[in-house]
Each structure stands twice: as structure tokens, then as C-alpha cells.
């Protein structure tokens, strides 16, 4: 029987900075364990002289502490470290492949507040780690066996700073946009969330010819995601009105997700982006197997519009890693999450907010169509999502009344083509409740009942 992972969650290691497991001490151990595991992966060990790991981060203050700790661990195992500084998570994945490194690591807590941080790992090919490798790394951290593995003084690794990593990623992102098109004549608002995309996204858009109004582009280590970015898109939508812009782009802290605003200030989420891009690819025979991969959180309206156009939607559990795994298993090339993680596998190995925005811009420019009109391509089913902060993640079937209420809600909502989804977040102390159906009042009724039952028993 496999031992449960103790520090790896659904997207690497994450928590409050300087509190276990996101401490310098654990980062050092993770660095040592990761260095050893990647150095000895059978597929890589045969063909390499010196081994190397790319190390990037977002703009959090605690990134300095974790960067130095994890790099020290890696170096101590005889593996070189390639520092690339603040760069979007998809940029770290791309540079890992570009530099032919053994692995990539990015220090980020994505959309979380600045006082959280985390550590994500990528394989040599830019995809996220298999569970097996995560288990191997974690077992070395907790078993103590890593303490008995000590390369000699002349075998330790070297640290090198890669100065052109940002430029490499910028050119990679631009390559996802057709050479025959420019963004001349377009005014675009970009909210960078004071995060890792604060240089790359405005730069790419300007180089493609757009007039860019950038905000959330002055990180100070503590303002990442604070009242800005994809978690707080109101500022972006307001600036659309102020500047009479054609489009708004809002990233999260590591720029692996994106939300958009049309020219009227109307917000578009990942489901809207999937509908627009999937239908466009389908119309041009570019959607592999005529299939879009989405999670259980995505709106049922996606199925309706794709099926009407001759396509289909395959669903996975929540998490972009689950989406990517499904895409890899079957060769699909488009997938995403309602939250704004979008994977265009023709260009990227992971969620990339900038590349996703460029694909929508391509469709707008090619068709001469404003985003508000493109967004009318599908009809969203009424959906209500509640996030309940919890003090503990007790199994739902052990809570009084919760299973009964969920079952009753499912019975009523299924009669109108709806559904209920209740789960705990894999990255935050929250229970997430999704209700979907044809009648908003019914959704609100059941959301209130189930949320109240949860708050009484496990609410923070």
C-alpha cells in the first residue's frame, strides 16, 4: 500500500511562509532530495555529463529565503542550479526544456496572499511531476536516508545565473501568435497582480503592436495578488471603461492563469475562454479528437455548445495537473479550468495565462470581431459557487446532515439538468460547493442550507 504524501498537495508544496513545511529547513531537505532523485532518473542519467536544475520564483518576499535554501540543497548533491529570477510558472517550464535541464522548480503560491509560498516541480520535458517522483522525493526527506548521501567537495554543484530567461520566454510566447498578424490598433489593459508576469505580458503585447495600459506591475514583495489580478478583477474591468480599451487581461501571482474583460467591462472566465477557443479550433479542424478537456467545476453549457458543433467535453477532477494528465493520455491539445488555467498543448506544457490571452486575441484579430460578440457563442447554465473557510477537513460523510442535504439537492437539481459538487480545496483551508441548474432561486436555497451545515461543524 502506498504511503500518503505528507507535504505534496495537489500542486506541489504550499503553506504559510516560514511555517512548516514552507521553511528554509524543509526547503533545504527538498533541494537535497530533489537533486538526488533527478540526478539518478534512469531516462536522464545515461545521457548527461553535469546535471542541472532550473530555479525560478514569483515576486514574494519569502522567495529569497526559499530560493537560497533549496538551491543549497541541490548544489550539495552535485547538481548545478540555474537561477532565472522572477518568471511566470509557464516560463520556468519552458526554460527548463529550452536549457535541457534535468528538472525545473518554481517558488510560488500562485493566487494566494504574499505570506503564503510554495514549491512546484517540473520534469525535464516541462510537464509537472508524476506522483511516483513526488513520493520518491518526499520519502527521502522524511526517512533521513538523504543524510547518508554526501558527494565529495570536488563534486558539489555550481550556481549560474541565466540572464536571458525572460527574453527566451517572451520569444516563446510571441511564437504562439501568427506571424502575419499584429495587435496594432488595439488598446489592452493588463493587470499583472504585482506578480511574476509584471514584465513579460506587457512586453509581449507591446512588441506585437498593442497600446498597453499596465497595472499591478510594481511588486514590492508584499503586494502580490492584493486587491488586484485575477482574484480581484474589478480594477481591470474599471480601467476598460476609463481607457476605452478593447480587452482586459488579469493574471494571478505566477501568471499561469488568466481572466479577461471585454470592451464593455464584462468579465470572462476560463469557461468563456475554452468555449471561444475550442469552437474556433473545431471550425478549423485544429481541435485534436474534437475534444476539450475541462474539470468537474466547468459549466455544463460547455457540453451543450461543443456537442452542437460536433465536439465533446471530457471532464477530470479539479486541478490543472489532472487536466494535463488526461490530455497527455489521449493526445488532446486543449484543456482548462473555470479558474483561468488554460493549457494549449500545441504551445505549452502547463497552464499559461499569456499564451491563452494571445489565442483569444488571434481570434479577435482574424475575424475582426470584438470580444463581447465572441463571448455570445455559448449559453451558460446558472451556477452558484460557495467557498467556506474551514478549520479542519473532516470527511463530509462524517458530518451531520451534510450527506442528506447534498443528496436532496442532487435529486431536485438533476430533474432540471443540474448537479451538486462538494469538495475540499487541495491548496487552501476551504470547502468548495458548486450547484448548477436552471433555476437561480433553487440554487440559492440549497447553497444556504449546505453552507450553514458546514459552517456549524467545521467552519473556521
Question: For the regions a protein language model found, what residue spans apply to each?
Answer:
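Gly/Ser/Thr-enriched, mixed-charge loops and adjacent short helices
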Residues: 2-3, 16, 117-240
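Buried hydrophobic positions in well-ordered alpha/beta secondary-structure cores of metabolic enzymes
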Residues: 11, 55, 92, 105, ...
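N-terminal small/polar loop signature for handling phosphorylated ligands or for N-terminal nucleophile
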Residues: 40, 44-46, 52-116, 203-261
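Phosphate-binding and adjacent anionic-ligand microenvironments
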Residues: 247, 284-460
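Gly/Ser/Thr-rich active-site loops/lids in small-molecule metabolic enzymes
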Residues: 128-130, 214-215, 266-285, 353-362, ...
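Short glycine-centered, acidic/aromatic-flanked micro-motifs in structured strand/loop junctions
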Residues: 55-58, 190-192, 262, 346, ...
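An N-terminal, well-structured beta->alpha segment
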Residues: 1-72, 76-77, 159-186, 398
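Proline/glycine-rich low-complexity loops and linkers
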Residues: 91, 135-170, 175, 263-336, ...
Amino acid at each position: 500500500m502506498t504511503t500518503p504524501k505528507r507535504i505534496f498537495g495537489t500542486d506541489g508544496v504550499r503553506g504559510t511562509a516560514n511555517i512548516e513545511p514552507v521553511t528554509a529547513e524543509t526547503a533545504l531537505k527538498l533541494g537535497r532530495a530533489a537533486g538526488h532523485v533527478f540526478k539518478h532518473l534512469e531516462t536522464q542519467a545515461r545521457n548527461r555529463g553535469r546535471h542541472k536544475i532550473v530555479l525560478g520564483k514569483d515576486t514574494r518576499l519569502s522567495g529569497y529565503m526559499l530560493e537560497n535554501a533549496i538551491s543549497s540543497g541541490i548544489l550539495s548533491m552535485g547538481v548545478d542550479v540555474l537561477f532565472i529570477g522572477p518568471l511566470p510558472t509557464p516560463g520556468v517550464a519552458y526554460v527548463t526544456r529550452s536549457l535541457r535541464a534535468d528538472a525545473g522548480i518554481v517558488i510560488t503560491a500562485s493566487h494566494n496572499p504574499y505570506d503564503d509560498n510554495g514549491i512546484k516541480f517540473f520534469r525535464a520535458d516541462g510537464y509537472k511531476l508524476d506522483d511516483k517522483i513526488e513520493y520518491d522525493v518526499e520519502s527521502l526527506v522524511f526517512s533521513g536516508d538523504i543524510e547518508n548521501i554526501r558527494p565529495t567537495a570536488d563534486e558539489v554543484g555550481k550556481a549560474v545565473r541565466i540572464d536571458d530567461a525572460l527574453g527566451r520566454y517572451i520569444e516563446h510566447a510571441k511564437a504562439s501568435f501568427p506571424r502575419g498578424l499584429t495587435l496594432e490598433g488595439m488598446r489592452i489593459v493588463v493587470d499583472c497582480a504585482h506578480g511574476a508576469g509584471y514584465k513579460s505580458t506587457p512586453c509581449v503585447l507591446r512588441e506585437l503592436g498593442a497600446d498597453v495600459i499596465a497595472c499591478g506591475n510594481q511588486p514590492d514583495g508584499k503586494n502580490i495578488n492584493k486587491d488586484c489580478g485575477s482574484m480581484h478583477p474589478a480594477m481591470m474591468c474599471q480601467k476598460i471603461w476609463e481607457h476605452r480599451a478593447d480587452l482586459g487581461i488579469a493574471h494571478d501571482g505566477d501568471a499561469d492563469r488568466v481572466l479577461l474583460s471585454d470592451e464593455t467591462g464584462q468579465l470572462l472566465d476560463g469557461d468563456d475562454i475554452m468555449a471561444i477557443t475550442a469552437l474556433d479550433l473545431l471550425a478549423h479542424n485544429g481541435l485534436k479528437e474534437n475534444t476539450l478537456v475541462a474539470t468537474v467545476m466547468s459549466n455544463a453549457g460547455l457540453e451543450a455548445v461543443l456537442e452542437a458543433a460536433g465536439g465533446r467535453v471530457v471532464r477530470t477532477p479539479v486541478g490543472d495537473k489532472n487536466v494535463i494528465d488526461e490530455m497527455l493520455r489521449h493526445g488532446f491539445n486543449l484543456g482548462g479550468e473555470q479558474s483561468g488555467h488554460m493549457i494549449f498543448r500545441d504551445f505549452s506544457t502547463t497552464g499559461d495565462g499569456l499564451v491563452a490571452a494571445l489565442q483569444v486575441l488571434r481570434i479577435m484579430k482574424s475575424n475582426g470581431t470584438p470580444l463581447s460578440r465572441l463571448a455570445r457563442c455559448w449559453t451558460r447554465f446558472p451556477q452558484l459557487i460557495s467557498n467556506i473557510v474551514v478549520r479542519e477537513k473532516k470527511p463530509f460523510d462524517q458530518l451531520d446532515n451534510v450527506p442528506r442535504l447534498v443528496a436532496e439537492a442532487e435529486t431536485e437539481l438533476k430533474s432540471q439538468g443540474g448537479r451538486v459538487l462538494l469538495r475540499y480545496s487541495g491548496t487552501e483551508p476551504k470547502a468548495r460547493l458548486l450547484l448548477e441548474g436552471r433555476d437561480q432561486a433553487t440554487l440559492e436555497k440549497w447553497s444556504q442550507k449546505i453552507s450553514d451545515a458546514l459552517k456549524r461543524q467545521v467552519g473556521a
